Structures are given as C-alpha cells and as structure tokens.
C-alpha cells in the first residue's frame, strides 16, 4: 500500500510508535472500504508509520441514505466527509419512517386482499343477493361485502318462519301450506277436547265448554280484530262441512290418557308375546367309547418309540 501513504508528512515524527499521537495539520485521505474490497489488487501490509496516523471511521455512502434524502426533497448528495453523528442520525431516522409507511401499506394490502377473497367466495357460493347492514365496529369500506348470516336470515323469512303476529292469522287458512315451516301453530289444549276448538276465532261461542271458562272467551275476543271467519256450510246431505283448520297433533296428556284407556280395555294386548322355545326331551346320551383298532395306534404313537 505504497499509494496509501499520507499526503502531508507528519509534523511530530518523534512520537513513539506505540502511542497514538494527535498531530496538527494531518489530513488523511478518506478511504472507502467498499472500494478497497472491490479493488482487484492484492492487499499489502500497512505502512510502517502506523502509530503516527490518526485513524477515523470512514462511513461509506449508502444507497438508502441517498434515497431518503431524495424522498425528503433534498437534492444535494451527501458528501463523503459526512460526520459520524449526522450519519447515525440519518440512519436512525430513515428506517423508522420507512418501517411505519411499510406497515400501513402492508396492512391495507392484506385487508383488501382478504375482502376480495371473501367477495369472490360469496359470489361463487351464491350468497351475494342479500343486503347487509353493518354494526358500528365495521368501517364504511367493509359494508359493501355481504355476509352469510344475513343471507340465511333472508332465506328463513322467505321459507315462512315469521313473527308471532304474522303466524296467527295464517293458522286459520282453509288449505294447508306446502312448506312445513308455515303450518298452523300448535296450540295448548285444555283438559276437555271440545274446549280446544274455542281458542280459534269463530262466530259461534255457544259451542264453548263450561270447563274452559271465560279464558277462551277472552281469547276469541282478543283475536277477533283479524275479522271473524264465518264457517262455510254446504247442503251436502245431512251434515255440514267445516273449513279445514290444519292437522292438530294430540298433546302428550291425551296420548297418556289414550294409552291408559287401551290398557284398561285389553290388558293382554300390551303384554309381550310368549316365545315358545322347544325343550329337547329325552335321555342324555352316554359318552361314546373310542373304538380304536391296532392300526390306529400308529397315528397316536409318538415317533420316538
């Protein structure tokens, strides 16, 4: 490294080599270590006056510093003789600002990609035909994406699972509906079978049983705001047909009562049938004696004999 000698000779050359002297007026040429590494010439030993040379850390010009200065609007390039403190400050400032910006950009990109994938899936699954009202935790950008729960709720409303007020007049229709969800609502029955029909709105309260009392009368008055339904009567012989009110399932109490009546009428009908197991009768056969002949002993005899 003869070419790397100091350009100005040392003023205090009498200083010992072991001590680091601080000579006045010595300016060492700033050496970039990146250039040294890229130099194809072989490395030579250091100069002999090593102790008289004041070594300073050389900070190479980095690309990200240049980019940061351009982004901030500084057109001037950083000089090679940049001080250590300014370089450390710029190194500390730049990654923090760039990391924050990268964090925000990546978050927005991930959110957008997730929403697009959800939208694509819902479009494929056929769930895009229902409206969606967001709660206050969602942003305005996320409100346009539809959700599965709202579509299911809309399907339930279409299939007939309506509220109680809408279900009550639908129970008095003359023909049963095709969907099982909109069938007439099951009503609690009273103790008497004739009292269950009085809960329906009808023009003839004289058929009410005395056991139902004023409760059923109040019920018929309550639901009379939907309009009293007149029963259609036809002259078809000696009986009149009433409108079909829907199949009424028997209550568990009536099932228990009917089963008790059946047991009282015919107790043998509910007993389990007897199984006729044939018993093997006869004498026990004595164990048969072995009929071994002398030629069979060859099979039973071990080979060692």
Swiss-Prot record:
The protein's UniProt keywords, in alphabetical order, are:
Cytoplasm, NADP, Oxidoreductase, Phosphoprotein
Q: Which GO terms describe its cellular component?
A: cytoplasm; mitochondrion
Biased composition range(s): Low complexity: 169-183
The record's subcellular locations are: Cytoplasm
Stated EC number for the protein is 1.-.-.-
- Sites bearing Phosphoserine, chain numbering: 182-183
Task: Name positions with the PTM Phosphothreonine.
Answer: 44, 175
Output the Gene Ontology terms for molecular function: oxidoreductase activity
According to the record, the residues making up region (Disordered) are: 37-56, 158-236, 259-305
Q: Which domain of life is it from?
A: Eukaryota
Instruction: Please tell me in which tissues this protein is expressed.
Output: Down-regulated in the occipital lobe of an early stage Alzheimer disease patients.
Where along the sequence does the record place the motif called Flavin-containing monooxygenase motif? 67-77
The keyword Amino-acid biosynthesis is assigned to this record: no
User: So what family is this one in?
Assistant: Belongs to the P33MONOX family.
Self-association and partners: Interacts with NELFB, NOL12 and PRNP.
Sum up the protein's function in the record's words. Answer: Potential NADPH-dependent oxidoreductase. May be involved in the regulation of neuronal survival, differentiation and axonal outgrowth.
What is the name listed in the Swiss-Prot or TrEMBL entry for this protein?
Answer: Putative monooxygenase p33MONOX
């Amino acid at each position: 490294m003869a070419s790397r000698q100091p350009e100005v000779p040392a003023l205090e050359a009498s200083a010992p080599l072991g001590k680091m002297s601080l000579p006045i007026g010595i300016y060492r040429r700033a050496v970039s270590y990146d250039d040294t590494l890229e130099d194809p010439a072989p490395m030579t030993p250091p100069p002999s006056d090593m102790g008289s040379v004041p070594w300073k850390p050389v900070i190479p010009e980095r690309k990200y510093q240049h980019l940061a200065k351009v982004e901030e609007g500084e057109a001037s390039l950083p000089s090679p003789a940049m001080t250590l403190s300014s370089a450390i400050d710029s190194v500390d400032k730049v990654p923090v600002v760039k990391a924050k910006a990268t964090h925000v950009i990546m978050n927005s990109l991930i959110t957008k990609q997730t929403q697009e994938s959800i939208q694509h899936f819902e479009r494929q699954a056929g769930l895009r035909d229902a409206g969606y009202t967001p709660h206050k935790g969602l942003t305005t950008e996320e409100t346009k994406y539809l959700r599965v729960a709202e579509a299911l709720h809309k399907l339930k409303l279409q299939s007939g699972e309506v509220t109680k007020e809408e279900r009550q007049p639908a129970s008095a229709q003359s023909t049963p509906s095709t969907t099982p969800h909109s069938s007439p609502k099951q009503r609690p029955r009273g103790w008497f079978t004739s009292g269950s029909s009085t809960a329906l709105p009808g023009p003839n309260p004289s058929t009410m049983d005395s056991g139902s009392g004023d409760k059923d009368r109040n019920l018929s008055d309550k639901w009379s705001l939907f309009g009293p339904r007149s029963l259609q009567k036809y002259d078809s012989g000696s009986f009149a047909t009433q409108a079909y009110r829907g199949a009424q399932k028997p209550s568990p109490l009536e099932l228990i009562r009917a089963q008790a009546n059946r047991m009282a009428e015919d107790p043998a009908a509910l007993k389990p049938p007897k199984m006729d197991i044939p018993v093997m009768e006869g004498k026990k056969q004595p164990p048969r004696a072995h009929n071994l002949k002398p030629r069979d002993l060859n099979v039973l005899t071990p080979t060692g004999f």
